[in-house]
Amino acid sequence: MRYAVVHDLAGANPVAGIRTSGIIRTRRKRNYVRVGVAELPQLLRDVDGYVGGEHTRLALKLMAYTFVRTSELIQATWSEFEFAAARSNIPPERMEMRKPHIVPLSRQALAVPNELKMLSFGSDWVLPGDVDRRKCMSNNTILYALYRMGYRGRMTGHDFRGVASTVLHEQGWPHAHIELQLVHQEQDDTSAAYNHALYLRTSSKDDAGL
């Protein structure tokens, strides 16, 4: 109608005063459904006992330890790892924010690529594909492994990031540090989706008068 008024095809816009917000309901964004913190130990035990392939089992472990994005994990190459410095360096072209990212590796996390190195058979990929080792692991491999473990609809590879954020917030780690490791921009929808524990903890302190 605005087009018609501007081009003298109509004298007035009869719906000009109607706000679409009062007619069309805005869909509320919902956070992902994922395994709760209390269930995390069982999930990790299930990962340890996974028998669907050693590369996949180790990929799940490394994702749990580092909580990087699935693409950042499966496309990793050996040149990105600094074993002496206990870290991996993800180049900007592989990052969603197009900035280089350093992933510190704990003793447990560092043990995983050491195991994978023995299974690499000379591949440049840390996680080579099952069929063609010239390619990296499929981005569905981790998801389907979680399905086979009984976590369909409750856990994806991406959800390890949310679980990690919740656990670290509950343990009192600084929010800014967690966001930095997750490579989030402050105050965006993604940050809000992952941050379950921070406001609960703050609310509890407020209720206690702290």
Regions found by a protein language model. Give the residues of each.
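Conserved beta-strand positions that form and line the central face of beta-propeller blades
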Residues: 17, 89, 126, 159, ...
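Non-catalytic DNA-binding core/recognition domains of DNA-processing enzymes
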Residues: 1-4, 18, 105
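Residue-level signal for tight coil/turn positions that link beta-strands
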Residues: 84-85, 107
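Residue-level detector of conserved, well-ordered beta-strand and adjacent loop positions
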Residues: 19, 91, 106, 128, ...
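Short, basic (Lys/Arg/His-rich) helix/loop patches that form interaction surfaces
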Residues: 45-57, 66, 103, 111, ...
